[in-house]
């Protein structure tokens, strides 16, 4: 499974790289803090497969990188190969500002 660090992702976003973000956390978590992208809670992924492109990089993120790892494993089982996990999730992202 491909991984990306918070710093690497921040640099990609700042350089306007073609990347899609998917936040798989629950709505209440997203309301507290997010870095944008689509919001598809992990439990709803099966109903939203058609919204996930297969022709560009897609970075999945959650709070710590654990749920997004599991989500990527499930999506890879459904044929997706372009998925990247935000290592450490939002916790790692927030630590960039500290």
What are these regions (language model features)?
Residues 1-20, 24-59, 64-98:
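Rhodanese-like catalytic fold shared by cysteine-dependent sulfurtransferases
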